[in-house]
Design a protein with these regions (language model features):
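Glycan-binding loop/region signatures in secreted carbohydrate-active enzymes
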Residues: 48, 68, 223-286, 304, ...
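Bacterial N-terminal signal peptides that target proteins for export
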Residues: 1-8
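Generic structural signal for well-ordered alpha-helices
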Residues: 81-89, 122-129, 154-161, 206-214, ...
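Conserved, mostly hydrophobic/aromatic
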Residues: 52, 101, 139, 192, ...
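Active-site groove signature of glycoside hydrolases
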Residues: 105, 124-150, 180, 195-198, ...
Length: 320
């Protein structure tokens, strides 16, 4: 018996919608110890994340490591990066959240330019991951600018994967102004987060967000490896590149509607992603069937239980 075309069409549509609804979207978040000590990162926000990254390690040019410890607040809080991880691990006990180390800054350009240093760096990272029972590493090296820097960074990524093997979760964080790592490096990582934000207000409109995502997809980053990053902070509209936490706007009583994307704070106009914008950007990532979402960061948002929380809006759109 022949099945009418309309019925076939609707069957395909239902299957597509079902797959769309069932996709398990990944949620990656950064944890900053200084803000953790100040009580600015809610335990429920940590527990709602699939991936928690601690940006506490800096590479030296020879591949050795230095670590940034959190500062106490009002004589309270953890004082070492190891204790920060232990405390957060207790916060998320009973969840499937992965805890990973994040490497940023330092003398990374000199390190990745040297073959021996790349190997030393990767081995040191693996040792730290093992000693602290961590789930992996995120590289947030800002930013490769020249062809040589992209090549060196890509070689460092390949060396990291070679040393780590498949035991650890390995990601890199890139930006629309700096994303052209090699195809081999793209294949080597588990996922790539794209920082669709910055100190410049041009990054905030939905149109720019969508075009940046399409740009890196066209370059060759697979959609199933791409995690879209959104900001939980605002920047000055005049391009002076000042930043301020969304939390501050709420605390000052400046947020009056989910549709709001501008606020005048201490005499200056800031642009930011309000709740409706976060919802729209999250929905776009889902429509594009990306791996998931990332934010910068939990400390600049409201607690998850607050109805004005941007993270809460993101999770609602993801079906959490």
């Amino acid at each position: 018996m022949l099945v009418p075309r309309k019925i076939v069409f609707f069957l395909f549509l239902l299957v597509g919608l079902s797959l769309y609804a069932q996709q398990d979207y990944f949620v990656s978040s950064y944890v900053r110890g200084n803000f953790y000590n100040r009580g600015r990162i809610a335990a429920e926000s940590l527990r709602a994340s699939d991936d928690l990254i601690f940006l506490n390690v800096r590479p030296h040019k020879d591949g050795s490591l230095s670590f940034e410890n959190p500062r106490v607040f009002q004589e309270k809080g953890v004082t070492t990066w190891e204790d920060l991880i232990k405390s957060v691990r207790a916060d998320v006990k009973g969840t499937k959240a992965k805890l990973r180390l994040g490497a940023a800054g330092g003398e990374w350009k000199a390190m990745v330019a040297d073959e021996a240093a790349r190997t030393t760096f990767a081995k040191n990272i693996k040792k730290v991951l093992g000693e602290n029972k961590l789930d992996g590493i995120d590289l947030d090296f800002e930013w490769a600018e020249t062809e040589k820097e992209y090549k060196d960074y890509s070689l460092a990524i390949l060396k990291m994967r070679e040393v780590l093997g498949d035991k650890y979760l390995f990601s890199v964080s890139l930006h629309p102004v700096s994303y052209k790592i090699s195809k081999e490096a793209i294949a080597a990582v588990d996922f790539i987060s794209l920082q669709c934000y910055g100190p410049s207000p041009v990054r905030f409109p939905m149109e720019k967000y969508a075009s940046d995502i399409q740009m890196v997809l066209a370059y060759g980053i697979p959609k199933e490896k791409l995690v879209a990053g959104v900001p939980f902070y605002g920047v000055t509209k005049n391009g002076s590149k000042k930043t301020e936490a969304y939390f501050s706007f709420v605390q000052d009583g400046l947020i009056t509607t989910p549709a709001q994307n501008e606020a005048t704070y201490k005499g200056e106009v800031y642009v930011f992603d309000g709740q409706d914008h976060i919802r729209t950007k999250t929905r776009y990532a889902m429509e594009q069937q990306l791996k998931g979402m990332m934010s910068w960061d939990l400390a600049t948002d409201m607690p998850l239980k607050d109805s004005r929380s941007l993270f809460r809006t993101m999770l609602e759109e993801l079906g959490r």
